[in-house]
Swiss-Prot record:
Single Gene Ontology MF annotation: proton-transporting ATP synthase activity, rotational mechanism
Protein name: ATP synthase gamma chain
GO cellular component: plasma membrane; proton-transporting ATP synthase complex
SUPFAM superfamilies from the UniProt entry: ATP synthase (F1-ATPase), gamma subunit
InterPro entries: ATP_synth_F1_ATPase_gsu (IPR035968), ATP_synth_F1_gsu (IPR000131), ATP_synth_F1_gsu_CS (IPR023632)
Source organism of the structure: Histophilus somni (strain 2336) (Haemophilus somnus)
Length: 289
């Protein structure tokens, strides 16, 4: 059994670690709430653009934007959004499993796959696999700036318009709640058809006049909409990261508390044994006299 002094040192070390994990838990909780607010505030913008795009595309059936046209899929682009930092449980591992499963499915169909990577963890992982990477970006911090994300998104969209990619998907961790984050893959382009239920029951009740003309507006809005979808995915992934980190740090804090309790019992036993030995020595010395 270790001596009482060694056990006291271990207890002190675990207590220091517990203070750090508790602080990280509280910081993650604060950041998660801020990210949730940012996530909620960006949704109405995306919803409004969805409605306008649906209205214009249905009213001008003679004009088909490339982002709305389905074509034979020979090349797929996947935008994978991961975290820049660790200590967030199995968040990235589950995301990578989802992405690799889809990549495997595409390759089995003889479809070429190109990746766009956002987040240092994803960049490091997929570079090690030797997959084709078309664009990458990291160092977003806790408040991602839309302008910084537009570059990597536009590279994927330009490749689609040039015919180098036939479909683009985005993979990220969808924020369900504090305890649940789900890795998902969603189609970006060609844009899935929007039904009236997803746009609101009054989406077709008004006739609008668009200037300079519907086609020019549609060209601009589609790009803005897709950029907003990428930004929304990044923000949701960030909220998932903070939630996962908060849960992981809480578990670490609780485990540290349990370890301290166990060490305290061991320390008490060691101290009791030491006192017993000292008493035995005193009694033995007195008996010898």
């Amino acid at each position: 059994m270790a001596g009482a002094k060694e056990i006291r040192t271990k207890i002190s070390s675990v207590q220091s670690t517990q203070k750090i994990t508790k602080a990280m838990e509280m910081v993650a909780a604060s950041k998660m709430r801020k990210t949730q607010d940012r996530m909620s505030s960006s949704r109405p913008y995306s919803k409004a653009i969805q409605g306008v795009i649906s209205h214009i595309s249905k009213a001008n059936i003679d004009y088909q934007h490339p982002f709305l046209i389905e074509r034979e899929v020979k090349n797929v682009g996947i935008l994978i959004i991961s975290t820049d930092r660790g200590l967030c449980g199995g968040l990235n591992v589950n995301l990578f499993k989802t992405a690799l499963s889809e990549i495997k499915n595409w390759k089995e169909q003889n479809v070429d796959v190109s990746l766009g990577l956002i987040g240092a963890k994803g960049i490091g992982f997929f570079q090690s696999l030797g997959l084709k990477i078309k664009a990458q970006h990291s160092g977003m911090g806790d408040t991602p700036v839309a302008e910084e994300l537009i570059g990597i998104a536009n590279r994927m969209f330009e490749a689609y318009k040039e015919g180098k990619i036939d479909a683009i998907y985005v993979t990220y961790n969808k924020f369900i709640n504090t305890m649940s984050q789900k890795p998902i893959m969603e189609k970006l382009v060609p844009l899935p058809e929007l039904d009236n239920d997803s746009l609101g029951k009054n989406s077709d009740n008004w006739e609008y006049i668009y200037e300079p003309n519907p086609q020019t507006l549609l060209d601009s809005l589609l790009v803005r909409y897709l950029e907003s979808q990428v930004y929304q995915a990044v923000v949701e992934n960030l909220a998932s990261e903070q939630a996962a980190r908060m849960v992981a740090m809480k578990a670490a804090t609780d485990n540290a508390g349990n370890l301290i309790n166990d060490l305290q019992l061991v320390y008490n036993k060691a101290r009791q044994a030491s006192i017993t030995n000292e008493l035995n020595e005193i009694v033995a010395g007195a008996a010898a006299i």
